[in-house]
């Protein structure tokens, strides 16, 4: 049994001196059996308006500046460093005790674009997304792996969005980069047609990108909740770097990833992308990805996707 982190839900822990470190959000704890108490203590400190782990260290846990930002955003707080040298990273991943002021985040307007990678067969989902988020984003662009006629037919149904077409040709990163170039907005949320941002993520988008701009970030990793045949799977948090500045680029034909210095990226753990999957499609995808690139099939991912979610642990 591997216990899940009480901040991000990850179950992969690293040994670091006398601590266990979450390999995702950077939380360090003395005893994994105290994770619930640790998260309550973190929230209490954030609610107090100041977290100074140098002057007032916690006994059971610690966070460095980057880790504190991860935790703060997860629980709906914005943070500002107590002391900052101009030109340095505001929240560095340096294992020093975090020191920051905290305030409750508030919904802010934004001019984020929504980019959708799609196949011609996904027309019904595209129309649903276009209607559901018509007023939630500055613009919506679909990049269709299809023909000009298919793109034109789709555009006629939803004329308030832009529909372009280009063959995927087995290269997910290249297709995402094309979509990045088409958006003409500073920040872009990219989704696939089987994904939907939940209400909490939609409400947070404005303050997230404003905070990211202050902190010099270009790529934000979102959690993805995989719903296989309608049931949440054990594959969580399944981080996806989908909220990005338009100048950020992806690499990797399969399982594409952002090309960005680590200090310019962060987790954004508030809300989630809901990902609807069919169990048979999960099995088929493993075979398809492996055929596209050796090792990309990741059978361990399939096993997690087909196992039920347990909020406490991966068993």
Language model region names:
Residues 96-103, 112-136:
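Short, well-formed alpha-helical segments that are part of the catalytic scaffolds
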Residues 117-121, 143-146, 167-168, 192-193:
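Structural motif
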Residues 2-99, 173-180, 197-315:
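Catalytic-site signature of metal-activated, phosphate-bearing donor transferases
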Residues 179, 185-198:
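Short beta-strand-to-loop acidic/aromatic patch adjacent to the donor-nucleotide binding site
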Residues 136-138, 183-186:
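Short, well-ordered alpha-helix to beta-strand connector turns
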Residues 112-115, 138-142, 217-220:
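Hydrophobic beta-strand segments of well-ordered beta-sheets in folded domains
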Residues 129-169:
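Acidic donor-binding segment of Leloir-type glycosyltransferases
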Residues 118-123, 127, 147, 173, ...:
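Generic signature of mature, soluble extracytoplasmic domains
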């Amino acid at each position: 049994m591997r216990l899940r982190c009480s901040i991000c839900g990850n179950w992969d822990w690293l040994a670091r001196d006398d601590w266990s470190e979450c390999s995702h959000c950077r939380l360090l704890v003395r005893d994994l059996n105290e994770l619930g108490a640790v998260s309550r203590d973190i929230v209490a400190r954030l609610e107090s308006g100041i977290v100074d782990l140098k002057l007032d260290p916690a006994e059971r846990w610690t966070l460095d500046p980057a880790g504190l930002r991860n935790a703060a955003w997860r629980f709906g707080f914005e943070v500002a460093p107590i002391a900052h040298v101009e030109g340095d990273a505001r929240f560095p991943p340096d294992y020093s005790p975090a020191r920051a002021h905290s305030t409750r985040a508030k919904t802010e307007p934004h001019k984020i674009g929504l980019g959708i990678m799609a196949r011609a067969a996904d027309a019904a989902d595209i129309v649903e997304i276009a209607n559901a988020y018509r007023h939630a984003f500055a613009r919506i662009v679909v990049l269709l792996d299809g023909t000009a006629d298919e793109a034109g037919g789709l555009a006629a149904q939803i004329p308030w969005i832009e529909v372009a077409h280009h063959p995927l040709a087995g290269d997910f990163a290249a297709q995402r980069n094309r979509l990045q170039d088409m958006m003409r907005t500073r920040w872009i949320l990219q989704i696939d047609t089987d994904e939907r941002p939940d209400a909490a993520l939609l409400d947070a988008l404005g303050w997230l990108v404003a905070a990211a701009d202050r902190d010099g970030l270009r790529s934000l990793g979102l959690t993805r909740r995989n719903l296989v045949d309608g049931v949440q799977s054990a594959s969580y948090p399944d981080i996806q770097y989908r909220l990005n500045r338009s100048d950020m680029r992806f690499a990797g034909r399969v399982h594409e990833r952002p090309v960005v210095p680590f200090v310019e990226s962060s987790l954004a753990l508030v809300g989630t992308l809901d990902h609807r999957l069919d169990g048979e499609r999960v099995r088929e995808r493993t075979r398809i990805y492996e055929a596209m690139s050796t090792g990309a099939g990741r059978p361990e991912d399939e096993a997690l996707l087909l196992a039920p979610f347990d909020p406490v642990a991966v068993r």
